Every structure is written in structure tokens, then in C-alpha cells.
């Protein structure tokens, strides 16, 4: 925290935490300028985020595998030890509750991450079902959020930097593929490195005890200096993930969104007998046509900016005085100016959105009655083939 203050971080509240929102290069730099700079440099060389606030929960016991299969939509039975998997947790109503990464050490030992603000809720959710529905399972839960500092380093030069720091680790693609992790000794303490990314670039997450965190953070910057490694905050994190089409729980989701609504069908274990929310996914309303679905939108006039929260409409203009309800198709959930594409990119939840690709629609604006013409596109704006992720 002191390093962030020293390096001109501006903070925002995230759950119970103060997180760096963005870093000012100098006093005259605006938030917009800082975020554009951080985003561009991360994709050009490398950037690093303090992700320590992510919730971390340890699951142990002889029935840990069965418990995990019940808690998440994903299947973990065939998952190999020392691999990771992006996972989705639903409520009993079948709506998305939280997401995170599941690390499988073995069938009796898992570590999961949660959203920063969702950690207490997820742990309580797990405890409730363990105590009231499955008391026969021998499983033990432990919150380890504050036991590990987490760094997320990503960008095409991230491997070059991190290999200088951990010289005893082989970071080649063959030895350290995407969505695997390693544990190692680092200066008489245990560290964990996972190859994962929330930016869409080559990336790694480093977990280490808080006592060694500052020393390691500064060492990473020492080796990253030649690559102009930049620290970035939560706003740049959100912009970079939007370019890649990654969702944020609570932004693309609002308690009424299912995995199918955001094109996450692939995250539902097809052969699983049961998991929390499975029955609700088969309800008539949950499976009906015309539900809001996640899409990307770009303005036809690339100089225009789309505001978050605005409505998606079929009409080009609104009357100066609205006397009857205006039919709308959905809303804008995320919107940023992409410095890497040089125009505004937005994500939206639109009724039947997957069938509207390429269609021209309109987005309302707070600046008048003339709506912004947009095109409905795939929400993945950068690297749709994942070549950067697995490079």
C-alpha cells in the first residue's frame, strides 16, 4: 500500500478494500490519460496489477472433489493435478453468483479464488451447504485471502521479466502451459505461480506471503525496467478485460443472468448428475427464447463514445417529450475507449442478442434525443483465437 501511495496511486473502494484505481505519471495526468497509457503499455510490453484483494479459499478433505463438483457448474473429476480452471458458481435459482479460478492440487485439496467483494459471501455459501445439505462430506474450508499477496503480471514481455526473477523455474510453453501452476521455494517461503490472465495477454499470477511481497514486487520492477513495465489499477484491468470480452460479476451480471445468457454454456459440466442451480437452469423462464444475451457493440461513427447504463433501442431518435413508454432491447453493461483499437468498445445485454450479430441498432445518450447508431458484434474485440494467451 505504501508503494502504491509513493507511486501516485489514486484509490477506489472495492468491497472492504482500498485498491489502486490508476497511477498518475505526474500531477497533470488525468484519469483518462493514465488508463489509456497503462492499457497500451501492458499490451505493448507488460503491466502488473496488485490483485491481493481477490478472495482465496482452501478446500481440503477426502470428499473435497465431490464437494467441488456440487458447488460449481464445472466438472473437476478428470481435471489433472496442478492445473487450473476458470469456474462458475450459481445460486439455487440458476443465476450467476460468482466466478474465479479453481486450482486442483489433488482430489483432496483445492484452492479457489473469488471476486474481491464476493469472498465472504462465497465462503458463507460453501459453509451453509456443507453444514445443512451435505454434513456427511468430510471437507474443511479455510479463508486464506490475507495469507497471500497476489501479483498479476501480463503482456508479451511478462515471461522475459518473470524468468529473471524466478531463475529456478522453466517458463517455456512446454514446461509451463496455460492454466497450470507450480509451487516453489522463494527465499525460505512457499510461493505459487499460476499461468492465467484477465487481460487476454500472456500472463502469470504470483502468490506469496505478505512479508516477502514488497521485496518481490520491487525485484519484478527492477527486471521490468528495460521493458517499461507499468503498474496498473482496477480501471485499466476493466478496460483490458473488456477488450478481450471477459465479464465482470456485478457488471455484466446482476442476479438475473444465467451462464447461457453470457455464452458460458461450455462451463456447464454436461455429464454431472447435480450441482447447485442445475434444476433451475431447466425452468421454462430460464431457458426461454428472447432472454438478454451478452454481445459487443461498436459505434458506426468511431469518434462517438457510448455511455454505460444506456438503453439499446431500435429507434434512431427519441421524441423531445416522451409521453408513452419506449420499448428497449437491453442495456450497455461496460464501455471504454480502447487505446489499442482507437475507438469505443462496449458490452451489452440485449434480448436475443446472439441472433442480432451485424445488425444496426441505437444507443440512448444523456446528451440529447438523437441516439447513437451502433453495430452488434462479437464481444471479443482482441485476439479471438487466443493466440496471445497461449503464446
Regions found by a protein language model. Give the residues of each.
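Conserved, structured C-terminal
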Residues: 1-13, 19-30, 106-108, 113-391
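Acidic active-site catalytic centers that drive phospho-/nucleotidyl reactions
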Residues: 50, 99, 205
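Well-ordered mid-protein domain cores that form the structural environment of catalytic cofactors
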Residues: 75-129
Amino acid at each position: 500500500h505504501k508503494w502504491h501511495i509513493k507511486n501516485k496511486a489514486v484509490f477506489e473502494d472495492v468491497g472492504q478494500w482500498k485498491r489502486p484505481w490508476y497511477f498518475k505519471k505526474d500531477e497533470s495526468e488525468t484519469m483518462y490519460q493514465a488508463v489509456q497509457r497503462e492499457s497500451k503499455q501492458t499490451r505493448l510490453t507488460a503491466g502488473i496489477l496488485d490483485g491481493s484483494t481477490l478472495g482465496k479459499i482452501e478446500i481440503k478433505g477426502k470428499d473435497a472433489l465431490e464437494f467441488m463438483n456440487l458447488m460449481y457448474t464445472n466438472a473437476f473429476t478428470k481435471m489433472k493435478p496442478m492445473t487450473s480452471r476458470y469456474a462458475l458458481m450459481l445460486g439455487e435459482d440458476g443465476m450467476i453468483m460468482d466466478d474465479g479460478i479453481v486450482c486442483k492440487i489433488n482430489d483432496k485439496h483445492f484452492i479457489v479464488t473469488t471476486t474481491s467483494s464476493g469472498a465472504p459471501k462465497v465462503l458463507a455459501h460453501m459453509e451453509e451447504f456443507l453444514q445443512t445439505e451435505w454434513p456427511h462430506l468430510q471437507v474443511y474450508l479455510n479463508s486464506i485471502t490475507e495469507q497471500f499477496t497476489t501479483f498479476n503480471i501480463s503482456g508479451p514481455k511478462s515471461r522475459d521479466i518473470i524468468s529473471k526473477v524466478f531463475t529456478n523455474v522453466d517458463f517455456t510453453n512446454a514446461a509451463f502451459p496455460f492454466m497450470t501452476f507450480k509451487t516453489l521455494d522463494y527465499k525460505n517461503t512457499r510461493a505459487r505461480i499460476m499461468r492465467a490472465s484477465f487481460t487476454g495477454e500472456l500472463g502469470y499470477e504470483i502468490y506469496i506471503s505478505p512479508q516477502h511481497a514488497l521485496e518481490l514486487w520491487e525485484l519484478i520492477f527492477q527486471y521490468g525496467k528495460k521493458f517499461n513495465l507499468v503498474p496498473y489499477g482496477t480501471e485499466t484491468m476493466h478496460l483490458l478485460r473488456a477488450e478481450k470480452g471477459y465479464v465482470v460479476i456485478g457488471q455484466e451480471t446482476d442476479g438475473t443472468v444465467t451462464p447461457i445468457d453470457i455464452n458460458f454454456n461450455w462451463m456447464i459440466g454436461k455429464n454431472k448428475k447435480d450441482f447447485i442451480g442445475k434444476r433451475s437452469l431447466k425452468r421454462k423462464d430460464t431457458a426461454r427464447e428472447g432472454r438478454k444475451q451478452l454481445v459487443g457493440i461498436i459505434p458506426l461513427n468511431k469518434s462517438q463514445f457510448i455511455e454505460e447504463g444506456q438503453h439499446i433501442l431500435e429507434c434512431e431518435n427519441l421524441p423531445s417529450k416522451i409521453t408513452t413508454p419506449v420499448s428497449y432491447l437491453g442495456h450497455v453493461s461496460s464501455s471504454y475507449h480502447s487505446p489499442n483499437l482507437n475507438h469505443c468498445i462496449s458490452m451489452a445485454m440485449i434480448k436475443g442478442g446472439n441472433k442480432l450479430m451485424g445488425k444496426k441498432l441505437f444507443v440512448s445518450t444523456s446528451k440529447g434525443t438523437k441516439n447513437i447508431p451502433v453495430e452488434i458484434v462479437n464481444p471479443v474485440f482482441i485476439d479471438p483465437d487466443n493466440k496471445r494467451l497461449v503464446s
